[in-house]
Amino acid sequence: METQLQSIFEEVVKTEVIEEAFPGMFMDTPEDEKTKLISCLGAFRQFWGGLSQESHEQCIQWIVKFIHGQHSPKRISFLYDCLAMAVETGLLPPRLVCESLINSDTLEWERTQLWALTFKLVRKIIGGVDYKGVRDLLKVILEKILTIPNTVSSAVVQQLLAAREVIAYILERNACLLPAYFAVTEIRKLYPEGKLPHWLLGNLVSDFVDTFRPTARINSICGRCSLLPVVNNSGAICNSWKLDPATLRFPLKGLLPYDKDLFEPQTALLRYVLEQPYSRDMVCNMLGLNKQHKQRCPVLEDQLVDLVVYAMERSETEEKFDDGGTSQLLWQHLSSQLIFFVLFQFASFPHMVLSLHQKLAGRGLIKGRDHLMWVLLQFISGSIQKNALADFLPVMKLFDLLYPEKEYIPVPDINKPQSTHAFAMTCIWIHLNRKAQNDNSKLQIPIPHSLRLHHEFLQQSLRNKSLQMNDYKIALLCNAYSTNSECFTLPMGALVETIYGNGIMRIPLPGTNCMASGSITPLPMNLLDSLTVHAKMSLIHSIATRVIKLAHAKSSVALAPALVETYSRLLVYMEIESLGIKGFISQLLPTVFKSHAWGILHTLLEMFSYRMHHIQPHYRVQLLSHLHTLAAVAQTNQNQLHLCVESTALRLITALGSSEVQPQFTRFLSDPKTVLSAESEELNRALILTLARATHVTDFFTGSDSIQGTWCKDILQTIMSFTPHNWASHTLSCFPGPLQAFFKQNNVPQESRFNLKKNVEEEYRKWKSMSNENDIITHFSMQGSPPLFLCLLWKMLLETDHINQIGYRVLERIGARALVAHVRTFADFLVYEFSTSAGGQQLNKCIEILNDMVWKYNIVTLDRLILCLAMRSHEGNEAQVCYFIIQLLLLKPNDFRNRVSDFVKENSPEHWLQNDWHTKHMNYHKKYPEKLYFEGLAEQVDPPVQIQSPYLPIYFGNVCLRFLPVFDIVIHRFLELLPVSKSLETLLDHLGGLYKFHDRPVTYLYNTLHYYEMHLRDRAFLKRKLVHAIIGSLKDNRPQGWCLSDTYLKCAMNAREENPWVPDDTYYCRLIGRLVDTMAGKSPGPFPNCDWRFNEFPNPAAHALHVTCVELMALAVSGKEVGNALLNVVLKSQPLVPRENITAWMNAIGLIITALPEPYWIVLHDRIVSVISSPSLTSETEWVGYPFRLFDFTACHQSYSEMSCSYTLALAHAVWHHSSIGQLSLIPKFLTEVLLPIVKTEFQLLYVYHLVGPFLQRFQQERTRCMIEIGVAFYDMLLNVDQCSTHLNYMDPICDFLYHMKYMFTGDSVKEQVEKIICNLKPALKLRLRFITHISKMEPAAVPPQAMNSGSPAPQSNQVPVSLPVTQ
């Protein structure tokens, strides 16, 4: 091949050589030149035609090498003309020629003439290269240019500029050689943010990159760097807050020139989240940290160090370190965060201590030094035994800096809890010294002079063998010697003995034959707070081991109340999670269950129901699954344990947070049976109600009409196979649409009331006619016999006023588990009986019998009966009768009302502050004993039956507390049925005080007002009543201003029904301001301080958000009005809203409005429509500047040139950034149905792109279907605008954005729909967008499309970017 090529080209070159040798003598005319070219090409064409496809590239490379081997510019020029003609006549493929020329090793800038001629040729033929080829050439040319040094002779610059001209041609927008988006991507790869382009390119490249700033802006959320989440709020777990763990930058899509602040590390965001209590899961989520992979994260380390420095600064200004003060809460939280992140090796302890030393050096901050040492002591004492001494020595360096005293530091007052902090440094020294001794290290660290008195005091205290509990000496000794077993036994032994009891004394517990060890006073919280994590771990380990030992021994003596209460308190500490709650759920519970220690099991479930706070949802769902397993075991089929298991399960189900339901239940999709009850219809109904509420509050089903393809489907189908049931139409109408559709399709035939009555009569006849006692007992308690026995007991009481002993025996034989079915039928039977009763005397008789069955005979507990009644699916009149029975049961006799009022009056919900709970608990049970084994009936029958059932220990529960989750359900049922509103008000008046003991009163109110928004719209009085009853029940246990605003309490609570209070703008501004100040960490904050460990909410912002939403939903104003008023806080000029942090206000509005029901936030769509229809976007003369300035909120705001469109844009972004994917899924419909018909101008189109562009990434990750619909809508709008305009001025930014959308998000998923639209556009647009469609008639030349190489911005194959299956 080479020989043939040589003969063809050398023939032509020969004549050139002669001409060069005798210049002037031989001169070719242009015609001769042409002839030579044609003959050379003719010979080459023949040769090329015989070549195989595989040899083409090799052939062209040889020709280039041959040309570059020539030294005469004229010869090179002639040969290049040959190549150009070969390309122009279609003989050679232009892409291959250009690539071979530029990739040639001999093309060097020093050969300036060759360089200039080569790039001239490339410039001539590059127009025929396909767009991907042009992209690859651009990359190679840019890299070639980089080989030119910074200084060259000015004589050669002109020649070198030929390369720049090729680049200029490639970047020329009107030439459209490739999507400009490809070009900017290649440029930004070589010249990222902050790197200057090569001098040869000058401003050519930077100007071109600048043309992409509008595209970058279209893809950016306005003020994104100022937006902050509420930790533990539903939105906080979504992708919006993710950061790069190495740089802390936002993960931005595409290599666009985004605004500078988006490229900065987002330290403020991470720092804000870290400052929030209970934020560690969110931090891991944001940074993609996984506990299983121990990876150090230096940026996180830096922020933790900065937080400690901030706490040191705060301590410097605080007068005193008071109990529950801001500074104490901050140090407490810091210690918890530090232990977690260092324990899982996301942060390195020695690095952090050295960094702290560096940042505190020379600052003179020493007021907080004891607290800092306390935080470090927590980690040191817990991990020094497992790590090298060298890791902890930097602490001594910190000591030298912070403790400059030359004299002794005096011993603090050990009656105060702060004394443990003052001793922290001495404790650290003791641990370091102990480690050095154990390691036989040469490094003996002498006791620092200033700490000598502290050390002597500890040594002396250790010699005192009888330690008292009245000061903090025991805590000090535990903290100092927790790594020294000889010394540690004494103080830890003293603690343990206090709560275990001395082994001899016994005290009674509620119920018959139930005794416990005699210690009743738990360890107080401030003592537990004063123990290091290491000491607390030893204590909790000791307790858990003792409980397991007692479980194995099947001890008949119950655990001491002090031990149970202390154990509950220890479980609040997140720092000891592995031995705490994790051990409780994964080890202790299963072990106790295996040992059949039912008393201890009952105790653990009671602890979980009444004493635990902030337990992570996966532990709660794990417990629920344990409970369903438990319920199926024969041994748990006894009244008290069965009741406890069901009550605990009910609490777990109803207390699930709306944003927790989906993530938790999707973990069980492969086997939904584990989290569902195989036999309890009530528990499964409770789960469906929770599902309905959760999907409503998170807007999960918004925009969908079926549960097909969603995670709910398997759960619902499994429930229907376990416990088939129906829902009353008034309950069903509140369900989200897809759930309604499911239950309408899966309708279950109900037994008619008439049949039920007939069956009862039939069984009653049998009862009366049978005479053999054993036959009667067998018949009525047999498995599979109809569950009508309670109906029979009712009939007996109605007719004979008593029940005989056989009745009692049958009940006993039926067993707790089977009896539930009898209660269910009885509930239906009661409704039938009451519906047909004649009223008057007969009705009173019915009520009396019913109450006797509960209170006199103890046949069924009130909470179970009410739960069954509330969960039946009666319609119309019968539903009203059912609720009438509930009301009678709760209010008619005094039994329950007295129990409630006494319990509320004598007890406080703040159990962590009490040391006498047990005494009050026992007094209450003496006055109102719980009877769970039909005792009343046993006493009444003739002859009376002696009951032998020993009670399982009851430490916390009673009928009032058990009734609370049932009351939650009752209120909801009453809300659904309009005619029973008055009865609900009466119930709230008499029993509302119980909400004082609800563990989530505000959340319950929030969920209720949110879920029933439609039902409560026109019932302002009832809403107010509900809020007043629940919030009012807490008035004695909460400081003023903890929840509702003063204005609301003054104006709304006292407003009359006919004249409701309508708030003004000032009210809304103050309400939003309250959340803004809370999130900014203002001190003192808008809400009183509290111990977040025992609060309903995990941090101040979550509390502020929920109470604000409750207050807004409780207003007697429509959702639309409230929504508009909230938007007006920033869209209207408000004197109360400071200009300088307007984005913080937008952030707060975004958080609040997205946490409210749809009517509140949907008003934003109306605002967007009015902006899009406003003259500044519809008329070309209204705004003559650059539209991107008009939409730039930051620039408009800073230059005081406020425009309503930029404000609305920024606010819409804040709202949508906080929205759930369900809320966002209304955007496609909004685009196609509302905006598409009105978008006619270029400004309007660009505004819509600005609005929705930044959210394509979330749609791609979370709901692909919506992303595809939006993609198509964007093209439809473009077609509209193109048809309505004579000329588009901003065609390039529009096309750049559409290319970005294709390569970053939609891929080819919208190709079919889009091709049709592009074919109808005007030529200039069609030319620019032709690469999106791949339609051959739009391609520049019939060039075979080449395979795309790896430098591409995104795949171009026929697939959607597959980050999510197209599920919805």
UniProtKB/Swiss-Prot annotation:
Gene Ontology molecular function terms on file: transcription coactivator activity
Keyword terms: Activator, Disease variant, Intellectual disability, Nucleus, Transcription, Transcription regulation
Biased composition annotated in UniProt, kind: Polar residues: 1347-1368
A GO CC term assigned to this protein in UniProt: transcription regulator complex
Biological process per Gene Ontology, one example term: RNA polymerase II preinitiation complex assembly
Assembly mode: Interacts with ELK1. Component of the Mediator complex, which is composed of MED1, MED4, MED6, MED7, MED8, MED9, MED10, MED11, MED12, MED13, MED13L, MED14, MED15, MED16, MED17, MED18, MED19, MED20, MED21, MED22, MED23, MED24, MED25, MED26, MED27, MED29, MED30, MED31, CCNC, CDK8 and CDC2L6/CDK11. The MED12, MED13, CCNC and CDK8 subunits form a distinct module termed the CDK8 module. Mediator containing the CDK8 module is less active than Mediator lacking this module in supporting transcriptional activation.
Name the UniProt record assigns to this protein: Mediator of RNA polymerase II transcription subunit 23
Gene giving rise to this polypeptide: MED23
